[in-house]
Each structure stands twice: as structure tokens, then as C-alpha cells.
Amino acid sequence: MPVSQYMNLCLFDPQHGYYTTRNPLGAGGDFITAPEVSQMFGELIGLWMAATWRQMGSPENVRIVELGPGRGTMMNDALRAVQVMPAFRAAAVVDLVDISPALRAEQQRTLEGLAVPIMWHQTLEDVPPGPAIIVANEFFDALAINQVIKQDDGWHERRIAIADDGKLVFTVRAEPIAHFDMLLPPQIRAAHDDAIFEWRADSPAIEVGKRIMDGGGAALIIDYGHEESSVGETLQAVGSHAFADPLTAPGQIDLTAHVDFQALAQSLESTGAKTYGPILQSELLRRLGIQTRAATLKANGSRETSAAIDAALARLIGFGRTGMGDLFKAIAVGHPKLGTPPAFDP
């Protein structure tokens, strides 16, 4: 079967899928996302949303849409941070797009008591029409990829099959994909033999762009990946905060792959929407004032609290193996009439 089919079965099968049957987030799960590292992340995303709403002309009604909200931590912190803007809170209706019953239940627990209407949806297309501010943190990396490998007679699809011993293995389709070179960026066409190229279906990004064009507004997408299309296998599996073989324990471990921000931007712009970035996550959070927010939180805290805030700050904006600041990137999408979204000025 294609790699994309394998990923979709492992992650989203209604009875056995990884995301549909469990809560994988947090210290007790398999991985930790930026909102789980510190409240500062969600608070700053909330301020970005409020500033974007003002830039939109402060409409009386606005849909606040999150794709793949996890446990609801980011949205909870974001809405708490914008309590100082009652007009924005009064205008907002929150729409959470998530197919996982387990995570929806967790989101309900996290967000209960907030004085904001909240609705759940299976897809972005299900969200009612109107001006929207869309946020997606570590959403696109979990969308299924296809893989091809270059050989002397062209590009061949990489697939997954069952070996004689019953184990899953990668295989290569015998026939090359006809005229596949014509679809690739120049730097990919020039790749060496045995190079692996990955790509995703562009329909989820196109849905975001269409929504912005139809109803007005903006979107903020944060994920890990590379700025330009490139070769190299990035499919990875994570379980219990450690890397694993993606072909073992299907449905029991997380499968992701790097986001190709060049391809993502092209898909978004194909709808007429305008994109900004990508910029590093560290740059986004610095421009939104994370260092000032950290200092404020530390001002009245204990030594232990200050140390924890410093550690979280280093994780969110630091570089290298322990930091998320350079691997994670942000891209903004807006209606052409909106202008440059907050934090994305050159």
C-alpha cells in the first residue's frame, strides 16, 4: 500500500487509529507540543488572534478556528490571555476541528467554564461561514505523506508491504511514475539516484486558503519542517517520548513527517490568499513579546518557578537538539486586503 494509506490507517482508523483512540499528549503520553511546554505559548497566540481581529476591523462576530487542538491547552491559554479585551471575547465563537473522540472529550474538560461559545467539527468545511481567524499548531505534520525514490529510469513510488515473515517492510514499485519530473521543483528533479522525495495532498491547505478568501480573516500555521522543498526521508515515529520504527506497532505510535513550507505556501496561494513567512518559531515568539512575558511571570515567583520559566523559554525559542526555536517555523495567511498580519513585518 502507499505510505499515505498506511499513515492514514495508523493514525485515523475509527477503531484502531492512534489519534482516534487515545490522548497522546503531555508527560504521560508520547510527545509534548509547545502549548504543553508553557502557558506563554498559548497566551501569545491569543494576543496574535486579538491583534489580527483588530486589523480585520474588529468585526462583531468572528470564528476562532483551531485545527487539531490537542488537549485544548493552547486555546485555553489564548482565551484566558485575551480577557483584557472583552470586545474580542464577546465577538468570538470558538470552532475546534478534530476527528478524535478521545481528544474532543479532553478538550471539553480543559475548556469547560470559559464564557465563550465552543463548537466541534469534523472538518474545516463544516465550520459556519463568516470572518475567521484560524490557528494550526503541529497539525500539518500529522497529515499523510507520499514517498517516491529516484532510480535511473525515473521516480518510483515507495510502498509498504508484508514480508514472508509477516513483518512490514518498505518496497518500491517496479514501474516509474510517468512524467513525474514535470511536477517537481528544479532542485528535486536534479536529485541523485536513491534520493527520497515526500509530498502531501494539497487539499487541507487549499481549504484554509479558500476559507480566508471566502469569509475574510487570517491563519497562523506553526509546525516543524523545511523552508524549501528538498529530498530526504523525514517520516518518523514517536512513542513514550522516544523515536521508534514507523513500521512497528501500527496504531500504537505517532507518525509524522516534516512540513514542506514551500509547497504549503504554494497551495495556500493557489486560492488567491497571500502568505507571509515562514519565520522561525523563535522569531515569532520574540516579536510577540515572549521574553517580556517571561520576565513578568518571574517577577513574583519563587526561585523554582523562575527556573522552570527559564527552562520553558529556552525550549520554545532555543536552537539545537533541546530547542524548538529553529526547527519549528510559522507561516501566516491572509486575505489580500488585510495587510501583513501581526509579527510578520519584514
Predicted stretch roles:
Residues H179-P346:
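Long, Lys/Arg- and hydrophobic-enriched amphipathic alpha-helices
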Residues I133-P185, G232-D245:
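A mobile, often basic/glycine-rich helix-loop segment
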Residues M1-L67, R71-P131, E283, G289-T292, ...:
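Rossmann-like AdoMet
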